[in-house]
């Protein structure tokens, strides 16, 4: 299986899975800390208090709104389930809400991270889920090496000093 495997990309679900040399607590922090997340997620900051039923908003402040939704299930450092409404273009806005689930499982001295993007319409444009590979590659690189990964997405909204 490839490092990032699309386990099921048919119909209304896309699943990505990777193994990262880190602890569940550090991985949870990288997913939920706005400044840390911006380092591997195209400069996008996500603001939330990460409690069950709370809202979140993702954006590149002063540049573009990316997504918003609700934290449906918050179980640190194991599982985060969120509704996901994309905001970055009229095409993705018209799709409505989908769901993103982050599952963290310790495996020896590493973690398995599984990201499930589901409840997508059958005709969902890959623009909705096509960035996950770059985001997860950046997350893995940051946690394992402390370095930032240059990807087309990370360079798009990078601020000076944000990309190594």
Question: Where does each model-flagged region fall?
Answer:
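Hydrophobic ligand-binding cavity/cleft-lining segments
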Residues: 1-47, 164
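Hydrophobic pocket/interface hotspot
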Residues: 27-28, 37, 56, 71, ...
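Surface-exposed helix-capping loop/turn segments at secondary-structure junctions
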Residues: 141-151
């Amino acid at each position: 299986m490839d490092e990032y495997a699309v386990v099921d990309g048919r119909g209304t679900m896309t699943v990505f899975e990777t193994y990262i040399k880190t602890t569940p607590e550090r991985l949870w922090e990288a997913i939920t800390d706005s400044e840390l997340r911006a380092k591997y997620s195209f400069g996008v900051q996500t603001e939330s208090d990460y409690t069950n039923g709370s809202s979140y908003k993702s954006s590149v402040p002063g540049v573009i709104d990316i997504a918003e939704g609700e934290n449906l299930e918050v179980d640190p450092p194991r599982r985060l389930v969120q509704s996901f409404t994309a905001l970055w273009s009229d095409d993705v806005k018209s799709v409505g809400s989908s769901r993103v689930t982050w599952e963290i499982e310790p495996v020896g001295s590493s973690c398995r991270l599984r990201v499930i993007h589901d409840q997508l319409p059958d005709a969902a444009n890959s623009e909705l889920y096509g960035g996950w590979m770059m985001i997860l590659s950046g997350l893995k690189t940051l946690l394992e090496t402390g370095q930032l990964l240059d990807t087309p997405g990370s360079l798009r909204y990078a601020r000076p000093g944000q990309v190594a």
